[in-house]
């Protein structure tokens, strides 16, 4: 039974009620309770039956806010305070904001509004089965057991609209308990409508201060102080890739993640195959998570931060089951809002895990406001021209894909923001909403702390400003006044260079590019760039290289992981131990990292084909991996030695190849990315091809099973001469024009002495290519090319098209140019 005054209110017109329960609300109630609270009600009503958990609670209405302003006589006073000043004057902005907030905090709640709030709060306590002490001092010491602890959050009526994020502008108060504390928190929320950043933001976005009202949500606390919490997006925040869920997680209450006080863990999940019952966790990145926010049970504050033990920092904050559950909920929420709005609606969601029950909850969900508003027809690429010898002075997590420049301004405390000048690069430990008046004037933003979902990252995306977060030491290595270049154009890692380096911007209208009969595919290797590259017009990936993933993400020789205890003690062994610290069984490190890298490449282009070439390091290159020198022979000419297929079935390496197979099987079977086609490199004979297929089958990669296709690189003269026989072993060919050219012409392409003779357009090479295409066609086998020749020489590309090649795979920077050229060629050919 709802408390008396709440029942009385329900008899009035709904839009004149002072308090509404969340389960009474729907999304159309934004004018009444703001976007945040309307969204909570929508999820409680519509998504609880689908398993999405949202804590219960109630909301004061926008009518209650306006009633408060009117009854207290604040309207005229606030209009006078906020009228006629320049918001770029930070000192004056702070003075006016402080005055406006003081007016609200010193006002008294009308009796009926106070009663409505407290009656609803008491009802929450009763339904929670707890005994109230109603501010009796004798029981204050036992408040954790006598009163419901609640989260008190503000929700502006203009908040969380798809094209205007008000994220973090109004306040949130956690672990609030007792009548007076709830009332004070509500009043503080009202006052937060006039924080400096909120005044500045509304003015910039041309929102009338007095057209915006505020609703307050009083919601049962989720005890994530005893567990974990974080933020997730149902879209990739940097690239706009729509098929990914990004999840961040840290220990304790969620404010540290939102504010950027910690560097959280990050997880990426692929939506399409998640929905079909697979477990496609594409990446897991460990954050430092050095602090956690918990209840302050002994001090005078509601919450406090405490250090996280190193053992907890060194492990992931949530298990894979929780990652997948959260990703499922993100999909459910996104699908619901997309259907509700009639257009694609990616979501920005806050979640928390209750340490008492072990249950996950959604505590907020609002529209994503940056990527969803970007043009889907134009692709803009920033290319930094780094001089030889230039090294980055700091690194962190890139936000967006832009480049910014200017003089650094290192500010360690909010009280110093008056020294910031427009156009400078803001360098600080972290930001919160109080920094927004100067953030929008920055040429770039750099922080020591924070992850991709922290306050600095969210605001930088919205403002279209390049930012790098989580640098750890930027405030120490950068100096106020020195020119710097901040680049987010290279993938997930952002780099800061001293000086203003040259760069260029390339714009492509991707909606106007012509279709071609010849498939135009891409050569890729770096998973960090995959989501960006997938936005280019393409027909899939003709060559996905494992070498980049192994050299940069794994760094360790597979046999060194299998035989770790046999390695000599020394620096390399210590490095391997550090890299694999999360793994009890060290070979699992190789499998995990390779599966995540390949999975990301395959997911980016799904469901288009992604041809993954098995590792093709030469022995000298394998030796450069950590621990590699112990297991690799010295060869005089490794280019023609123990490489490609000959390694996979060899007793000396087959255990290492088994790890590769396990990773690729995980990508196809566990992640559900069956668009992956495998390709065997440097396969000298058809028999060798069969031996490799047998070896793969031992580890669950059976050609033809679950749609698995296996191609072979056509890069040796023998591959061409015996193409009929190779066609009986493999499903397709990819011409490797680099090796085929050097082996047809009998030269070393790495030797400068004969480099002038290397030419794919040589008549002998072209005859080899023509024979390969013709034989593949006769045997009903797919054939493409993945070398550099078609990119460099339009006449060579024309030759390939004339021969009827199925696909041409290009480096990403030549995809658009070559597509236009091939479309023109095909049109001329008729």
Predicted regions located by residue number:
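Structural motif
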Residues: 51-53, 149-151, 171, 215-216, ...
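Alpha-helix C-terminal capping segments
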Residues: 43-47, 239, 441, 457-465, ...
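Acidic, glycine-rich flexible loop/linker segments
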Residues: 75, 370-372, 394-398, 402-425, ...
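Extended active-site and interfacial segments that coordinate phosphate-rich ligands
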Residues: 166-200, 224-298, 363-395, 441-448, ...
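Conserved alpha/beta-domain cores
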Residues: 145-151, 156-166, 170-173, 211-215, ...
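Conserved catalytic alpha/beta cores of large enzymes that bind or transform nucleotide phosphates
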Residues: 244-348, 352-355, 391-403, 413, ...
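N-terminal beta-alpha lobe that positions the nucleotide/phosphoryl donor
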Residues: 1-217, 313-319, 326, 334-339, ...
């Amino acid at each position: 039974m709802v408390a008396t005054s709440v029942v009385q209110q329900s008899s009035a017109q709904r839009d004149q009620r002072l308090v509404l329960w969340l389960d009474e609300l729907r999304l159309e109630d934004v004018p009444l309770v703001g976007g945040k609270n309307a969204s909570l009600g929508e999820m409680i009503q519509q998504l609880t039956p689908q398993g999405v958990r949202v804590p219960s609670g109630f909301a004061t209405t926008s009518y209650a806010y306006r009633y408060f302003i009117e009854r207290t006589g604040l309207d005229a006073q606030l209009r006078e305070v906020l009228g006629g000043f320049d918001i770029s004057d930070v000192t004056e902005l702070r003075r006016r904001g402080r005055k406006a907030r003081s007016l609200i905090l010193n006002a008294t709640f009308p009796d009926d509004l106070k009663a409505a709030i407290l009656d609803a709060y008491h009802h929450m306590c009763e339904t929670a089965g707890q005994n109230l002490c109603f501010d009796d001092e004798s029981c204050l010491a036992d408040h954790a057991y006598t009163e419901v602890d609640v989260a008190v959050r503000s929700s502006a009526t203009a908040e969380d609209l798809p094209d205007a994020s008000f994220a973090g502008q109004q306040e949130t108060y956690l672990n609030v308990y007792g009548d007076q504390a709830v009332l004070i928190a509500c009043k503080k929320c009202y006052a937060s409508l006039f924080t400096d950043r909120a005044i500045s933001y509304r003015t910039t976005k041309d929102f009338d201060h007095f057209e915006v009202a505020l609703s307050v949500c009083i919601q049962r606390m989720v005890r994530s102080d005893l567990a974990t919490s974080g933020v997730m997006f149902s879209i990739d925040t940097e690239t706009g890739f729509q098929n990914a869920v990004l999840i961040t997680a840290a220990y304790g209450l969620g404010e540290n993640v939102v504010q950027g006080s910690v560097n959280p863990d990050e997880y990426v999940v692929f939506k399409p195959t998640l929905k079909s019952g697979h477990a496609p966790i594409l990446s897991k990145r460990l954050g430092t998570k050095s602090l956690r926010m918990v209840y302050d049970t002994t001090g005078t504050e509601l919450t406090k931060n405490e250090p996280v033990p190193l053992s907890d920092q060194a492990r992931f904050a949530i298990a894979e089951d929780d990652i997948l559950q959260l990703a499922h909920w993100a999909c459910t929420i996104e699908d619901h809002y997309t259907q509700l709005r009639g257009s694609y609606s990616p979501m920005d969601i806050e979640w928390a895990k209750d340490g008492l029950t072990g249950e996950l909850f959604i505590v907020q969900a609002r529209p994503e406001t940056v990527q969803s508003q970007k043009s889907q027809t134009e692709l803009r690429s920033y290319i930094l021209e780094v001089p030889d010898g230039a090294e980055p002075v700091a690194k962190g997590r890139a936000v967006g894909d832009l480049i910014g420049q200017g003089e650094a301004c290192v500010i360690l405390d909010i009280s110093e923001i008056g020294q910031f000048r427009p156009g400078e690069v803001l360098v600080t430990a972290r930001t919160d909403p109080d920094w927004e008046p100067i953030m929008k004037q920055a040429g770039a933003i750099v922080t020591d702390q924070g992850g991709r979902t922290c306050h600095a990252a969210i605001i930088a995306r919205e403002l279209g400003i390049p930012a790098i977060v989580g640098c750890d030491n930027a405030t120490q290595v950068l100096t106020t006044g020195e020119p710097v270049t901040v680049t987010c154009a290279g993938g997930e890692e952002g780099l800061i260079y001293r000086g203003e380096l040259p760069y260029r911007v390339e714009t492509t209208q991707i909606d106007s590019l012509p279709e071609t009969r010849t498939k135009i595919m891409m050569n890729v290797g770096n998973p960090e760039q995959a989501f960006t590259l997938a936005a280019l017009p393409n027909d899939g990936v003709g060559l996905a290289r494992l070498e980049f993933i192994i050299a940069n993400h794994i760094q360790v020789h597979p046999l060194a992981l299998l035989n770790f205890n046999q390695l000599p003690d020394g620096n390399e062994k210590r490095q391997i131990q550090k890299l694999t610290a999360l793994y009890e069984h060290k070979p699992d490190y190789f499998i995990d990292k390779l599966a995540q890298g390949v999975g990301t490449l395959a997911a980016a282009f799904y469901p288009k084909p992604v041809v993954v070439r098995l590792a093709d390091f030469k022995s000298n290159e394998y030796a450069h991996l950590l621990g590699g020198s112990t297991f690799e022979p010295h060869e005089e000419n490794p280019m023609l030695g123990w490489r490609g297929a000959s390694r996979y079935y060899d007793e000396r390496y087959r255990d290492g190849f088994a790890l590769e197979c396990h990773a690729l099987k995980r990508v196809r079977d566990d992640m559900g990315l069956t668009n992956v086609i495998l390709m065997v490199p440097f396969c000298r004979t058809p028999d060798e091809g069969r031996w490799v297929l047998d070896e793969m089958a031992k580890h669950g990669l059976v050609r033809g099973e679950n749609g698995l296709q296996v191609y072979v690189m056509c890069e040796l003269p023998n591959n061409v001469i015996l193409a009929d026989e190779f066609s009986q072993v493999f499903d397709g060919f990819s011409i490797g024009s680099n090796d085929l050219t050097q082996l047809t012409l009998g030269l070393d392409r790495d030797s400068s002495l004969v480099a002038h003779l290397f030419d794919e357009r040589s008549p002998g090479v072209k005859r080899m290519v023509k024979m390969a295409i013709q034989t593949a066609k006769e045997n009903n086998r797919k054939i493409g090319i993945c070398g550099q020749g078609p990119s460099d020489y339009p006449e060579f590309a024309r030759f390939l098209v004339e021969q009827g090649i199925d696909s041409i795979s290009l480096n990403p920077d030549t995809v658009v140019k070559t597509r236009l050229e091939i479309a023109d060629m095909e049109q001329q050919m008729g």
